[in-house]
């Protein structure tokens, strides 16, 4: 999977060729809820970084690795990557992975011929969250 980079937006018009950059909006909580319901898996407050949240992060990663999402993708991680994600009680790294999975799904939709990256018809100013139904 190619490395993801944040697109740079410019307020000025470009005279160069048409850009191939695409900005997609992902929402990690959407995919997390699909996999573990409303179970909390993260907290910035050290006092709330509980064993229950650790278990939830493990369950979330297991579901991603087993391909249990409706997106039809499986996450492949090294042991070190898995451990790093589980150990990040803030959930920031895991949120980034959830967004990456959503972006990978959108890219797969585009490669399969969907010029809208799997997004339904929507207001171009409002946009749509990738994989939101």
Regions found by a protein language model. Name each.
Residues 1-133:
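RNase H-like (RuvC/DEDD) metal-dependent nuclease/polynucleotide-processing core
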């Amino acid at each position: 999977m190619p490395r993801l980079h944040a697109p740079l937006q410019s307020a000025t018009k470009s005279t160069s060729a048409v850009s191939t950059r695409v900005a997609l909006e992902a929402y990690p909580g959407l995919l997390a809820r699909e996999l573990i319901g409303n179970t909390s898996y993260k907290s910035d407050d050290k006092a709330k970084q509980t064993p229950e949240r650790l278990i939830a992060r493990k369950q979330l990663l297991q579901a991603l690795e087993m391909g249990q999402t409706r997106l039809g993708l499986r996450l492949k991680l090294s042991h070190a990557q898995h451990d790093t994600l589980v150990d990040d009680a803030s959930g920031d790294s895991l949120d980034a992975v959830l967004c990456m999975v959503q972006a990978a799904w959108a890219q797969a939709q585009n490669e399969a011929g969907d010029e809208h990256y799997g997004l339904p018809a929507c207001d171009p100013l409002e946009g749509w969250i990738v994989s939101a139904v």
